[in-house]
Swiss-Prot record:
InterPro entries: Globin, Globin-like_sf, Globin/Proto, Hemoglobin_b, Hemoglobin_oxygen_transport. It comes from Saguinus mystax. This is Hemoglobin subunit delta. It comes from the Eukaryota. Heterotetramer of two delta chains and two alpha chains. GO terms for molecular function: haptoglobin binding; heme binding; hemoglobin alpha binding; metal ion binding; organic acid binding; oxygen binding; oxygen carrier activity; peroxidase activity. Belongs to the globin family. CDD domains: Hb-beta-like (cd08925). The lineage of its organism: Eukaryota, Metazoa, Chordata, Craniata, Vertebrata. Heme b binds at residues 63, 92. The gene is HBD. Residues 2-146 form the Globin domain.
Length: 146
């Protein structure tokens, strides 16, 4: 993904304030609530029967933290996202058979969660930079599908 120096700085500055545990759980939880068909990949997580059940589910929170940890790794390697996410792409494609569109959906949900958490600090300029990043990560995760 190509970011200008200013965009990289904006992403790094905001990301340094992100609570990965909370934001990860909220982002994955919202994905499962807003796009309920994505729940089929998480049937082993137990109670997903209502928005409250999803958002309070400790397995959703734990996996969201794991997902955002991988996203953080990607932020450290913006010039090599395909390489950074190669193993995860293979896992999600070959073993888990996740629809690659879900990566784009999760990226957009993450942007919504960041906007909710950071309010005025999440300016249109910062959002534009994050949209590039989440699109790049989604493309990298979908790489093995092509």
């Amino acid at each position: 993904v190509h970011l200008t120096g200013d965009e990289k700085s904006a992403v790094a500055a905001l990301w340094s304030k992100v609570n990965v545990d909370e934001v990860g759980g909220e982002a994955l939880g919202r994905l499962l609530v807003v796009y309920p068909w994505t729940q089929r990949f998480f049937e082993s997580f137990g109670a997903l029967s209502s928005p409250d059940a999803v958002m309070g589910n400790p397995k959703v929170k734990a996996h969201g933290k794991k997902v955002l940890g991988a996203f953080s790794d990607g932020l450290a390697h913006l010039d090599n996202l395909k390489g950074t996410f190669a193993q995860l792409s293979e896992l999600h494609c070959d073993k888990l058979h996740v629809d690659p569109e879900n990566f784009r959906l999760l990226g957009n949900v993450l942007v919504c969660v960041l906007a909710r958490n950071f309010g005025k600090e999440f300016t249109p300029r910062v959002q534009a930079a994050f949209q590039k990043v989440v699109a790049g990560v989604a493309t990298a995760l979908a790489h093995k599908y092509h």
